C-alpha cells in the first residue's frame, strides 16, 4: 500500500528565515536542517519543542549556522535524540561554525542558550552518521524500507542534495545549490538518480537574482582590482566572511593571485579566526569532497591547495598587532558584522577613509552589515555616523576584583568542606558495614556454641559421657599443628571472643594501611586545592560591559558576489530538468515562489505545486498503491521485461492468492478462479449459517485464456528532441505554434488528459512518411 507522506514547515516558509522542516513517512519522522538566524532568534525553534522527541533522523544539507545553528539548542533543551546524518565536511566544518559562534557570543555577552557540551553531543560518534556523496544508506528500525543518499550540491564543501526513497516514492530535498564550477568545488550534479522524483522540495529565494559576472574569471579580476587599488592607496581591506564555508573559495583565489604577482609580497594577507588553524587543517584533509581541479593539482604537484604560502593564519587580535606595520587584507568572521573579530576591526577602522570593507556574501536583512550598506548607498551616506551597541569582556579591578576573589575563596572553601563531608560519610559507611559484619559473625559464633552445649547436655543425660570427659582435650589436636595429618601444617592464629579478626584492605601494591590511606587522601585534597588555586590565579576574572558607540562611517564599502548560489534563470532550468511529479516551494517571498510556480505551470507537467506557510502541514501521500507479492517461478519464466531507469517493467495477468499457513500473498498465472459457495445459502440459512460464512472453493479452468490488453507507452520525450530524431532520419520538420509540421503531410502535438498524463497526437495523410514517423516515435518509448 502507499506510504503516508506529510510535510510541515517549522521555519523558512514564505520568507527567508532559516530552513527547518519536518518530513513524515508513515510513522518515521525526519528533520530537514535546523537553522538559526543571524540574530540568534531562538523563538523560531519553539515549534520543535512539541515534536523534538519523536524525531528519528536529522538530515543536514550544509554546515553553516543558517542550516545547523539551532541543532545544539534543540538537543540540549528539547531533548532531540534522533540520529544525525551528513557528509564528513558537514561534521568537521559544522563543528567549527558552532564553536566560533559560541566563542564570539561569549566575548560579547553571557551566552547561555547552549554550551560546548551540547555542540559535542551533536557531532559525537554515537550520534552523527557520516556519509559520502552518492552513498545509499538504508535505515533500520522504524525506518526500515527507507533509504537516504546525499548528492553533490556545490556552494560549500560537503553540501548535499538529499534523496529519500521508500518503495517507488522518491523525495529530493535541494536548497542553496550552485550550478557553476568553482576553484575548490564542483557544481550541482544532476544525475539520473535525482531526476523525475515523486516530490521535489526546493527554495525560491534566489529566483530574482541575476549573475553580475558570466564567468568566474571576470569576477575574480574585479575582486583583485578593488583590493590592489586600495592597498596601493595605503589602506587596509577588511573582508567579513563566514567561519568555514565560502571563505575557502576566497582563500584559494587570493592564494593563487598572490603567488602569480610577486609585487604583492609587500602586503600581508591574514585569515583571522579563533578556529582558523583547525578550518585549514580540516580543509586539507577533505580533498575527496572538492573539485577535480583541486584533486589533480594535489596529485600532479603533491601540493595541497590549502597549504597556504602567502596567507598568514592567526587566531587573535594580539597576534595581528604583532605583524609588521604594512597594509593588510584581513578575512575574518562574521560576514554580517554582528559578532567576532570582523565587528571589532570594523569599529577600529570604519573612521579611516582609506579602509575598504568588502562584502562577498548575501547580507541578512537588518544586520549591521545591511544597515551599513543601505546608509552608504544613500546620497551623502559616507561620513554619517551609525550607532551600535557593543558588549565586551574587561578585567575586574578594585572592589569588584576583591569581591570576586572573596566569592571564589568562599566557593573553594565550600567545595573543600563538601569533599571532607563526603569522605567522612564514606568512612562512617565503611565502619557501619564492618560493625554489621562483626555482629553477623558474633551471632553465628553464639549459635555454634549453643548448639555444641545442647549436644553435650543430651549426651550427658543419656550417660554417654560424664563431666570429666567434657573437659578432656584431644591429644592429637593442637592449636598450631595437626598431628593426624601426614605432615605438619602451620595454621594461622584465630582471634577469640571478644576480639574479632580485622578485614585487611588490598590495593595495587598489597596491603593498605588505614592511617596511611587517610593521610594520603588528605594530602591529595590539599594538592587538588592547591592546583585549583594556581589555576584560578592564572585566570584573569572578567565581566561584560555594554556601551553604545557612535561611529563615523568614512571608510569605503563595496560588494561583490562570492555567495556561490544559483541565479533565477538557472533555478528554473534546474527545476525543469529535474521534472518532479509534485513540487514544494520554500524559503522565499510569496512573489518569488509565485514566479517559479507560474514558470512551472507553463513548462513542466506536474500534479501539484505547494507553497506552505509556517506551521502548515501538507499531505503529499502518493495516489499510487504499492503491494509486495511473491512471484511463482511459473510466472517469472513467462515475463518479458523492459529496462526503464532502475526498474524492470512487464505487463502480466495473474491471480493473487494466500497459501495455507502463510500471510504473504502470492501472484501466479490465471489458471483458477476463487468463487464463494453461496448456492445453498437460501435453503440452509437457518441450519448451516456458521458453516457457510467462510466456505470458498476453487474453480479450475482447463485452459488459460487472456483477452490481451492495451499497450502502455512508458517514457517521456520533448518535441524538440523528437524533431532532432526526425531530422536525422531525413524528414523535413519545423515548429509551428507548438506543433511539429513534418513536410506538410504529418502533424505532431502534445496534449494532456484529465489525470495529467501526457498524450502525443499524430495526424496526417496515410503515406510512407506517416508510417516512418510513427515508427520513429514508437522507438522513443518502452512499450509493454
From Swiss-Prot:
Keywords assigned by UniProt, alphabetized: mRNA processing, Nucleus, RNA-binding
Primary subcellular site in the record, as a coarse category: nucleus
Pfam families: Beta-Casp (PF10996), CPSF100_C (PF13299), Lactamase_B_6 (PF16661), RMMBL (PF07521)
PANTHER family membership: CLEAVAGE AND POLYADENYLATION SPECIFICITY FACTOR SUBUNIT 2
Assembly mode: CPSF is a heterotetramer composed of four distinct subunits 160, 100, 70 and 30 kDa.
Task performed by this protein: Component of the cleavage and polyadenylation specificity factor (CPSF) complex that play a key role in pre-mRNA 3'-end formation, recognizing the AAUAAA signal sequence and interacting with poly(A) polymerase and other factors to bring about cleavage and poly(A) addition.
Protein name (record): Cleavage and polyadenylation specificity factor subunit 2
Species of origin: Dictyostelium discoideum
Lineage: Eukaryota, Amoebozoa, Evosea, Eumycetozoa, Dictyostelia
Gene: cpsf2
Amino acid at each position: 500500500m502507499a506510504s503516508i507522506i506529510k510535510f510541515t514547515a517549522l521555519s523558512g516558509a514564505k520568507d527567508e528565515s532559516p530552513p527547518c522542516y519536518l518530513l513524515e513517512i508513515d510513522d518515521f519522522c525526519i528533520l530537514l536542517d535546523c537553522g538559526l538566524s543571524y540574530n540568534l532568534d531562538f523563538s523560531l525553534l519553539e515549534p520543535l519543542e512539541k515534536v523534538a522527541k519523536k524525531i528519528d533522523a536529522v538530515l543536514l544539507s550544509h554546515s553553516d549556522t543558517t542550516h545547523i545553528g539551532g541543532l545544539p539548542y534543540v538537543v540540549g533543551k528539547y531533548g532531540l535524540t534522533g540520529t544525525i546524518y551528513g557528509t564528513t565536511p558537514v561534521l568537521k566544518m559544522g563543528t567549527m561554525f558552532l564553536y566560533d559562534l559560541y566563542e564570539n557570543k561569549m566575548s560579547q555577552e553571557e551566552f547561555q542558550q547552549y554550551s560546548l557540551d551540547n555542540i559535542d553531543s551533536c557531532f559525537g560518534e554515537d550520534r552523527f552518521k557520516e556519509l559520502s556523496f552518492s552513498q545509499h544508506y538504508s535505515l533500520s528500525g522504524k525506518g526500515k524500507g527507507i533509504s537516504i543518499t546525499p548528492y553533490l550540491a556545490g556552494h560549500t564543501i560537503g553540501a548535499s542534495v538529499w534523496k529519500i526513497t521508500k518503495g517507488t516514492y522518491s523525495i529530493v530535498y535541494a536548497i542553496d545549490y550552485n550550478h557553476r564550477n568553482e576553484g575548490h568545488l564542483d557544481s550541482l550534479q544532476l544525475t539520473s538518480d535525482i531526476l523525475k522524483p515523486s516530490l521535489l522540495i526546493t527554495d525560491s529565494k534566489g529566483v530574482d537574482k541575476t549573475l553580475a559576472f558570466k564567468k568566474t574569471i571576470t569576477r575574480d579580476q574585479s575582486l583583485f582590482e578593488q583590493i590592489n587599488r586600495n592597498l596601493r592607496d595605503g589602506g587596509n581591506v577588511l573582508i567579513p566572511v563566514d567561519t568555514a564555508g565560502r571563505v575557502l573559495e576566497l582563500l584559494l583565489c587570493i592564494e593563487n593571485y598572490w603567488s602569480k604577482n610577486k609585487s604583492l609580497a609587500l602586503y600581508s594577507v591574514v585569515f583571522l579566526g579563533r578556529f582558523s588553524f583547525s578550518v585549514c587543517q580540516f580543509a586539507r584533509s577533505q580533498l575527496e569532497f572538492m573539485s577535480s581541479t583541486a584533486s589533480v593539482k594535489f596529485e600532479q604537484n603533491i601540493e595541497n591547495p590549502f597549504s597556504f604560502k602567502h596567507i598568514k593564519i592567526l587566531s587573535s587580535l594580539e597576534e595581528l598587532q604583532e605583524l609588521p606595520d604594512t597594509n593588510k587584507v584581513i578575512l575574518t568572521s562574521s560576514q554580517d558584522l554582528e559578532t567576532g573579530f570582523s565587528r571589532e576591526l570594523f569599529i577600529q577602522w570604519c573612521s579611516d577613509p582609506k579602509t575598504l570593507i568588502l562584502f562577498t556574501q548575501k547580507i541578512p536583512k537588518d544586520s549591521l552589515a545591511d544597515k551599513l550598506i543601505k546608509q552608504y548607498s544613500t546620497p551623502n551616506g559616507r561620513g554619517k555616523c551609525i550607532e551600535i551597541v557593543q558588549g565586551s569582556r574587561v578585567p575586574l579591578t578594585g572592589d569588584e576584583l576583591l569581591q570576586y576573589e572573596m566569592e571564589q575563596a568562599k566557593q573553594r572553601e565550600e567545595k573543600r568542606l563538601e569533599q571532607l563531608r563526603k569522605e567522612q560519610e564514606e568512612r562512617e559507611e565503611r565502619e557501619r558495614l564492618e560493625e554489621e559484619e562483626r555482629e553477623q559473625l558474633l551471632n553465628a559464633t553464639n549459635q555454634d556454641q549453643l548448639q555444641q552445649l545442647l549436644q553435650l547436655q543430651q549426651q550427658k543425660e543419656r550417660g554417654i559421657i560424664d563431666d570429666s570427659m567434657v573437659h578432656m582435650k584431644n591429644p592429637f589436636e593442637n592449636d598450631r599443628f595437626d598431628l593426624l595429618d601426614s605432615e605438619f601444617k602451620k595454621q594461622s592464629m584465630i582471634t577469640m571472643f571478644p576480639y574479632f579478626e580485622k578485614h585487611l584492605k588490598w590495593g595495587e601494591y598489597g596491603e593498605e594501611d588505614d592511617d596511611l590511606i587517610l593521610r594520603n587522601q588528605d594530602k591529595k585534597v590539599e594538592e587538588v586545592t592547591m592546583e585549583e588555586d594556581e589555576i584560578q590565579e592564572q585566570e584573569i576574572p572578567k565581566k561584560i560591559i555594554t556601551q553604545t558607540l557612535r561611529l563615523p562611517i568614512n571608510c569605503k564599502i563595496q560588494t561583490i558576489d562570492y555567495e556561490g548560489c544559483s541565479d533565477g534563470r538557472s533555478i528554473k532550468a534546474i527545476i525543469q530538468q529535474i521534472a518532479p511529479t509534485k513540487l514544494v516551494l520554500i524559503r522565499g517571498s510569496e512573489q518569488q515562489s509565485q514566479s517559479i510556480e507560474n514558470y512551472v505551470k507553463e513548462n513542466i507537467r506536474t500534479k501539484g505545486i505547494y507553497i506552505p506557510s509556517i506551521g502548515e502541514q501538507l499531505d503529499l501521500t502518493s495516489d499510487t498503491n504499492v503491494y509486495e507479492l511473491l512471484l511463482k517461478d511459473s510466472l517469472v519464466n513467462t515475463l518479458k521485461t523492459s529496462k526503464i531507469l532502475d526498474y524492470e517493467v512487464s505487463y502480466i495477468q495473474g491471480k493473487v492468492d494466500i497459501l495455507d499457513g502463510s500471510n504473504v500473498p502470492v501472484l501466479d498465472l490465471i489458471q483458477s478462479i476463487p468463487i464463494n459457495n453461496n448456492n445453498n445459502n437460501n435453503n440452509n440459512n437457518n441450519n448451516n449459517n456458521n458453516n457457510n460464512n467462510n466456505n470458498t472453493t476453487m474453480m479450475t479452468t482447463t485452459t488459460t485464456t487472456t483477452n490481451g490488453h492495451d499497450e502502455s507507452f512508458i517514457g517521456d520525450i520533448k518535441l524538440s528532441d523528437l524533431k532532432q530524431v526526425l531530422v536525422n532520419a531525413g524528414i523535413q520538420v519545423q515548429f509551428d505554434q507548438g506543433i511539429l509540421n513534418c513536410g506538410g503531410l504529418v502533424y505532431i502535438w502534445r496534449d494532456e488528459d484529465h489525470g495529467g498524463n501526457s498524450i502525443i497526437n499524430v495526424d496526417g495523410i496515410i503515406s510512407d512518411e506517416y508510417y516512418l514517423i510513427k515508427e520513429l516515435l514508437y522507438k522513443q518509448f518502452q512499450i509493454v
